[in-house]
């Protein structure tokens, strides 16, 4: 090694890294997508989506019920927060049901299937008893409990069909009987048609459509062939066409599809058209919470069936897209739980609950947008109505319990250690010492020290 002019050894410079340009450089968007996929594939993703999505939908629904129901309550000479307080009470009770259902073992879920089905059938039959059943908006599907409280037994019929149908199909799959048509159809389809008949006696076709969707979802999960689907669908379509043709009210709802004027000939399309008006006047970010104009007596059922229209008017396109995204996340999580489990009951029950909530949301939102006839079904977890909220929150608790039963999710939860209290494997745990990052005070030194 030769020395420099000053006699010092030359300093070796570090080799410069070649500048990477073009496609060799990592794309930040690609990194973000990879990280998002990793987060999406985590074992507890479905658990958090169900828990967080349902909580956000319920809370936002409470806010919109309070906003959309004030004028209706005042018109009925009631306090402005009347409907909100009833919905808040139902949400509190539903939260308890959700917590209980999420902590139940799967065996207990299966044990509850037959009692819930029997109770739903008895209550739905009592609706038709004079003096017991109550008619609301032309549909006799209610039972007066006491005071101003009423229950709609047909809402519990959805939960009954999901649990009982899932238990029935799981038992037959364990015995390898689902390859035969008669075991796939009987007694599932006759029991479902019995529930549909009890519902249609009260004139509630919207709930009947949801129940039919749940039935088709269970048959699809059971592996029903296409010919079987076509046969059952043909029977359901024929019965539906007869019921629509024989009802002037249902024919009028069909005539309101695509209507742009409140009065289309002899048909009154006031509700459908004013729902479109509410959505159109909201713009991107809405007129502001509580500033809806259509809820001032212009839009019927503003806090129940058409609460999505009030949401679009007050929160705009951003608010409605947020609601759609939450329901999409909830539906994806339910499909993921049903697809990853090895327990046939969990697969059928999770698929049935997901079909129930997703189909009801699509029918409600489609009716508000003018894409589907008005079916008179509430938006799940969002619209006013305790009878619809309680079984729906119990069903969400089922999904949470099923998401926790996933082997990977169970392992991820077991690896977590509690930060406070006792350890999982017994014994006591010392209190955690927090790192405060404080600097020590300088120690005073004598004048003789350096």
Map each language-model feature to its residues.
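A juxtamembrane structural motif centered on a specific transmembrane helix
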Residues: 1-29, 365-450
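Active-site-proximal helix-loop elements at catalytic-domain edges
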Residues: 2-34, 275, 325, 332-357
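Cytosolic juxtamembrane amphipathic/interface segments immediately preceding
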Residues: 29-45
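Hydrophobic alpha-helical transmembrane segments of multi-pass inner membrane proteins, especially
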Residues: 51-67, 73-271, 309-367, 394, ...
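Glycine/serine-rich anion-binding loops at beta->alpha junctions
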Residues: 147-157, 201-203, 283, 287-288, ...
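Transmembrane helix boundary and interhelical junction motifs in multipass membrane proteins
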Residues: 204-209, 287-292, 302-304, 321, ...
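TM-adjacent membrane-interface loops and short helices in multi-pass inner/ER membrane proteins
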Residues: 260-304, 315-319
């Amino acid at each position: 090694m030769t020395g420099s002019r000053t006699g010092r050894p030359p300093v070796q410079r570090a080799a410069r890294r070649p500048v990477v340009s073009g496609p060799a450089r990592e794309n930040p968007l690609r990194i973000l997508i990879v990280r998002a996929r990793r987060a999406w594939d985590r074992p507890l993703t479905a658990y958090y989506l169900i828990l967080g999505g349902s909580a956000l939908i319920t809370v936002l629904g409470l806010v919109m019920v309070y906003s959309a129901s004030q004028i209706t309550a005042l018109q009925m000479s009631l306090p402005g927060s009347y409907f909100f307080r009833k919905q808040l009470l139902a949400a509190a009770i539903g939260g308890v049901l959700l917590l209980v259902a999420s902590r139940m073992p799967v065996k207990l879920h299966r044990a509850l299937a037959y009692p819930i089905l029997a109770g739903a059938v008895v209550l739905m039959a009592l609706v038709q008893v004079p003096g017991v059943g109550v008619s609301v908006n032309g549909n006799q599907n209610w039972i007066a409990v006491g005071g101003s409280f009423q229950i709609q037994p047909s809402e519990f019929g959805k939960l009954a069909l999901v649990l009982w149908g899932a238990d029935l199909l799981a038992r037959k799959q364990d015995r390898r009987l689902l390859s035969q048509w008669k075991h796939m159809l009987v007694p599932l389809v006759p029991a479902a048609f019995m529930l549909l008949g009890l519902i249609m006696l009260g004139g509630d076709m919207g709930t009947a459509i949801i129940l039919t969707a749940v039935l088709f979802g269970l048959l699809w999960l059971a592996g029903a062939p296409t010919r079987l689907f076509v046969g059952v669908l043909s029977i359901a379509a024929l019965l539906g066409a007869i019921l629509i043709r024989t009802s002037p009210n249902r024919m009028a709802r069909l005539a309101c599809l695509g209507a742009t004027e409140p009065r289309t000939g002899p048909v009154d399309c006031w509700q459908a058209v004013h729902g479109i008006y509410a959505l159109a006047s909201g713009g991107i970010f809405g007129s502001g919470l509580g500033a809806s104009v259509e809820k001032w007596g212009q839009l019927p059922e503003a806090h129940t069936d058409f609460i999505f229209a009030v949401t679009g008017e007050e929160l705009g396109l951003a608010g409605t897209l947020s609601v759609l995204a939450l329901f999409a996340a909830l539906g994806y999580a339910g499909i993921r739980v049903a697809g990853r489990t090895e327990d046939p009951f969990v697969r059928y029950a999770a698929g049935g609950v997901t079909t129930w909530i997703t189909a009801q949301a699509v029918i409600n939102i489609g009716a508000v947008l003018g894409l589907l006839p008005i079916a008179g079904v509430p938006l799940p977890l969002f619209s006013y109505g305790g009878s619809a909220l309680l079984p729906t929150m119990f069903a969400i608790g089922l999904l949470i319990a099923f998401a926790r039963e996933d082997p990977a999710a169970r392992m991820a939860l077991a690896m977590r250690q509690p930060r406070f209290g006792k350890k999982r494997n017994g014994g006591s745990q010392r209190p955690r010492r927090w790192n405060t990052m404080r600097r020590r005070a300088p120690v005073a030194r004598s004048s003789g020290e350096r």
